UniProtKB/Swiss-Prot annotation:
Record keywords: DNA-binding, Nucleus, Transcription, Transcription regulation
Family stated for the protein in its record: Belongs to the bZIP family.
Protein name per Swiss-Prot or TrEMBL: G-box-binding factor 3
Region (Leucine-zipper): 287-322
Biased composition (Low complexity): 166-181
Annotated tissue distribution: Present only in dark grown leaves and roots.
Length: 382
């Protein structure tokens, strides 16, 4: 961008009579001022007045162009063109949307890389509006598209004001859109203010202009850069912006949390099942070892029992033989004893007989001696 003296002068009017101007009594000079007031609140400082003559005097131009003028209450009812949903979710543009994932900080409300695109239906007013549209486009990190009511051409009006004035200074007033509508994306970086061909290029912080889609509505918050996209803007249209769109709705985060909890439960169940399976396997192996030890001990006891049974059988056989031997040896011992007893008994009987005989002989002798007379009588009688 160069100084105001370097800007091309508009061609002088010819002497031919021009057509009578169209009556523009009800047309506002700033067609999108109400939309801007709806989007800006007391938290965001509005740019001051910009005088192009200051650039010619050698002073650096201020970053803003006009002072704030509150035409509507900042916390009033939301503007229908900006908040088509009625303001139920987004009560004010300064309020962040939803909750962020854990471990991340809240993005700033407004950062130098913010891109605002507001399209409201306006009417084309010829060269006057065209000139105003060219001058009201440069902000310090806040790029706002000012269109003529066509939503498909609203985001294509992000142009550098000085370059557009150099290239489109002589366009007719029938169309309120600036040239370069086919430019889909515009990248700006705030790395410095280089000069090229004696013209100072004021570069704002990096932002990407995106074109709104016809079906999408609502305001989307870009995570990381703190940018608020206009209604219907798709952030996937730029590959550089797709990386910063990590903001996920709370329902998705809740679903992800449920899935993570479910996976943790499944993993814990698998681990517990594996531990129980290993414990049961260890118990089974220990029981198998005990069974083997008990079976071996049982076999040893059975073998000892068999040996004891064999020994008992042998002892029984020996006892039987001894009993038989005892039975055979008892009669031989009794015969001599009987013989001796008989001998003794017979000796005593003989003595008794001899003694009785002797007694009878003596008595008979006594009788004979005593009975001599009766015998003689008997003999005499006989």
């Amino acid at each position: 961008m160069g100084n105001s003296s370097e800007e091309p002068k508009p061609p002088t009017k010819s002497d031919k009579p021009s057509s009578p101007p169209v009556d523009q009594t009800n047309v506002h000079v700033y067609p999108d001022w109400a939309a801007m007031q709806a989007y800006y609140g007391p938290r965001v400082a509005m740019p001051p007045y910009y005088n192009s003559a200051m650039a010619a005097s050698g002073h650096p131009p201020p970053p803003y162009m006009w002072n704030p003028q509150h035409m509507m209450s900042p916390y009033g009812a939301p503007y229908a063109a900006v908040y088509p949903h009625g303001g139920g979710v987004y009560a004010h543009p300064g309020i962040p949307m939803g909750s962020l994932p854990q471990g991340q900080k809240d993005p700033p409300l407004t950062t130098p890389g913010t891109l605002l695109s507001i399209d409201t239906p306006t009417k084309s007013t010829g060269n006057t509006d065209n000139g105003l549209m060219k001058k009201l486009k440069e902000f310090d990190g806040l790029a706002m598209s000012l269109g003529n009511g066509n939503p498909e051409n609203g985001a294509d009006e992000h142009k550098r004001s000085r370059n557009s004035s150099e290239t489109d200074g002589s366009t007719d007033g029938s169309d309120g859109n600036t040239t370069g509508a086919d430019e889909p994306k515009l990248k700006r970086s705030r790395e410095g203010t280089p000069t090229k061909d004696g013209k100072q290029l004021v570069q704002a912080s990096s932002f990407h202009s995106v074109s709104p889609s016809s079906g999408d509505t609502g305001v989307k918050l870009i995570q990381g850069s703190g940018a608020i996209l206009s209604p219907g803007v798709s952030a996937n249209s730029n590959p550089f912006m797709s990386q910063s769109l990590a903001m996920v709705p709370p329902e998705t985060w809740l679903q992800n949390e449920r899935e993570l909890k479910r996976e943790r439960r499944k993993q814990s169940n698998r681990e517990s099942a594996r531990r129980s399976r290993l414990r049961k396997q260890a118990e089974t192996e220990e029981l198998a070892r005990k069974v083997e030890a008990l079976t071996a001990e049982n076999m040893a006891l059975r073998s000892e029992l068999n040996q004891l049974n064999e020994k008992s059988d042998k002892l029984r056989g020996a006892n039987a033989t001894l009993l038989d031997k005892l039975k055979c040896s008892e009669p031989e011992k009794r015969v001599p004893a009987n013989m001796l007893s008989r001998v003794k008994n017979s000796g005593a009987g003989d003595k008794n007989k001899n003694q009785g005989d002797n007694d009878s002989n003596s008595t008979s002798k006594l009788h004979q001696l005593l009975d001599t007379k009766p015998r003689a009588k008997a003999v005499a009688a006989g």
